[in-house]
């Protein structure tokens, strides 16, 4: 009976989760190894200005980046005895001043205010969890800021059709050869997937250490979107070789989104191969960044016409559009009304 109620509750959350403010989901805010643990770490979730610092027991405290004394920002303060000290008058900020919670998962920091889930989304495929705990895969991390709203960044990361045009160069995987075996997977109202076979270009084969260049082989691909801010994909070739690209996003302005990218592989695990993968990933991200800079930021036109034209292989995009229909960018006034 308990299991029944648990499943019922989980389904209710998945149905209504896209009406819940973004700040109540776990938002990736940083790659832990990139954060100086001896200094306060400044971050934003939408318009909500926040600051975090690490304590002696390796936990994190977060609060608004605002001293409730004379209103100083706290990012130029310092950490002393697990307190964040305001640089203006030395006011101490501790756990009693906390705003939201921070946890560490998959070598990343995640923040949420009154979270609806106990932990960030797990990335699983064929009963395999892709995380830093899985020693069969090497993991590397990078980040980039894109000049685009988060929903459109999500559409891009799940879109199949733009690769032919945006990623067709020497460091791209795009091809004029059509994909095969497209399938749309709808799991619930907060998670969807798509699978397809993609032509394996010669330049990509070389990077992926596949030296047989004559065959017209295809890779097996699976992409998944987990509302509100996670997408990931696994590319399989040569039976057992897997490359996983996992992106967690957080909006930092209405048309500015920070991407935290995880690169995983079970066959390119040495340092040279990892650096090659990271370099190619940055090239591909740079190609997307150029397109995002070309995107119109006219809100009236977007609200009226965005996604009114459709292409093949966009069933999953149509569902994403429905899921995002009630999404709203996190405004500070809305957050403070619920604080």
Where are these regions (language model features)?
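Hydrophobic, proline/glycine-rich low-complexity stretches
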Residues: 18-25, 31
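C-terminal catalytic domain of Rieske-type non-heme iron oxygenases
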Residues: 59, 117-339
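A short, structural micro-pattern
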Residues: 23, 95-96, 106, 243, ...
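Rieske [2Fe-2S] iron-sulfur-binding domain
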Residues: 28-136, 338-339
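N-terminal chloroplast transit peptides
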Residues: 3-18
């Amino acid at each position: 009976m308990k299991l029944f109620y648990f499943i019922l509750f989980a389904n209710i959350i998945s149905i209504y989760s896209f009406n819940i403010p973004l700040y109540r989901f776990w938002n990736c805010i940083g790659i832990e190894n990139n954060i100086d643990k001896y200094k306060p770490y400044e971050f934003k979730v939408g318009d909500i200005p926040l600051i975090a610092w690490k304590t002696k027991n390796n936990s994190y405290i977060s609060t608004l980046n605002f001293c409730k004394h004379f209103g100083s920002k706290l990012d130029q303060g310092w950490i002393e005895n697990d307190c964040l000290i305001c640089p203006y008058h030395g006011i101490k900020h501790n756990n009693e001043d906390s705003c939201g919670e921070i946890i560490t998962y998959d070598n990343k920091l995640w923040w949420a205010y009154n979270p609806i889930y106990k932990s960030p989304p797990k990335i699983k495929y064929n009963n395999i969890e892709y995380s830093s705990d899985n020693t069969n895969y090497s993991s590397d991390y990078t980040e980039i800021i894109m000049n685009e709203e988060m929903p459109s960044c999500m559409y891009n990361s799940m879109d199949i059709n733009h690769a032919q045009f945006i990623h067709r160069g020497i460091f791209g995987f795009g091809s004029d050869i059509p994909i095969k075996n497209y399938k749309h997977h709808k799991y619930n109202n907060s998670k969807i997937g798509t699978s397809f076979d993609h032509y394996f270009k010669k330049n990509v084969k070389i990077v992926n250490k596949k030296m047989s260049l004559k065959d017209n082989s295809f890779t097996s691909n699976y992409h998944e979107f987990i509302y509100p801010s996670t997408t990931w994909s696994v590319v399989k070739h040569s039976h057992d070789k897997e490359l996983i690209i996992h992106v967690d996003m957080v909006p930092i302005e209405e048309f500015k989104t920070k991407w935290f990218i995880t690169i995983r592989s079970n066959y390119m695990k040495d340092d040279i191969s990892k650096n090659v993968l990271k370099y190619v990933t940055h090239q591909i991200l740079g190609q997307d960044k150029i397109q995002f800079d070309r995107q119109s930021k006219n809100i009236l036109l977007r609200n009226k016409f965005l996604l009114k034209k459709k292409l093949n292989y966009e069933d999953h995009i149509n569902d994403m559009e429905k899921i995002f229909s009630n999404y709203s960018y996190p405004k500070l006034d809305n957050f403070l009304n619920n604080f």
